[in-house]
Amino acid sequence: MPARRNPTARQVRLGTELRRLREAAGLKATEAAALLGVNSVQMSQIESGIAGVSEQRLRRLAANYACSDDALIDALAAIATDRTRGWWEEYRGVLPAAYQDLAELDHHARFRKDVAVIHVPGLLQTEEYARALFAYMNPEFPDDEVGLRVEHRMRRRVVIDGSDPIPYETVIHEAVLRIRVAGRAASRAQLDRILAVSEADHVTVRVIPFALDDFAGAGSTMVHLGGAVPRLDTVVRDAPHGTAFVDSDAQLEHFRKLFRRVKEAALPPEPSRDLIHQLMKEL
């Protein structure tokens, strides 16, 4: 297959998982290349996501790697053969690649879990709230780029607002709900949006109140996206250099434990809604 100039996060993940399977089998890249009848450069491109791999070749590699996890192999084959061109492709080359990667990961996710301690999670943001955030960025974005970023964020909400939503669970610190990003009216509308979404059967919203003693998780902002199998989960975090996609087994387990701890510290859903109602009355 021809080399890709800019592989997506899912394509890179496929290559990463094939490399991990090869390493677990104790094979060198040159040995894996021989199994497919390609050279070491082509094998390196496959394992870095720069080049694709057919389902037949993927299953041949998995068999030679003695991988007996059929669910994982099927999930990897689904990624390898996926030809979806979603709405996010309209923004490729216009917005940063991470925007398209996150939208694509959302689209394919089996579930999503957020922890928010600074800003309202993107999927819950109103248009006015999102616009205020993007307009405040430093360096400043031109007005047309702010508009594109807001539009992209609003379209991403389809995964919880659309006709085929995914299970969504979020834990939000009270500080997030109190910060007036765009004034009183906008803050009231934002809280109303959170309350409305929280009523859906597939959505669970929990709030960590200021009154909670011994909460040291102020740096816990994260997005956890469920893969077709747990091994293919992805955690998304903001990093100094941009958006970081975390996928090693050890890191994933770390963030699963972190989410459980933060969730346990939060109020149950109904008291969380009561607190949000109270905050609306204060505006």
Regions of interest found by a model, annotated:
Residues 171, 183-283:
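C-terminal regulatory/effector modules of DNA-binding transcriptional regulators
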Residues 2-16, 20, 24, 29-34, ...:
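Interdomain hinge/linker segments and adjacent boundary elements that couple functional modules
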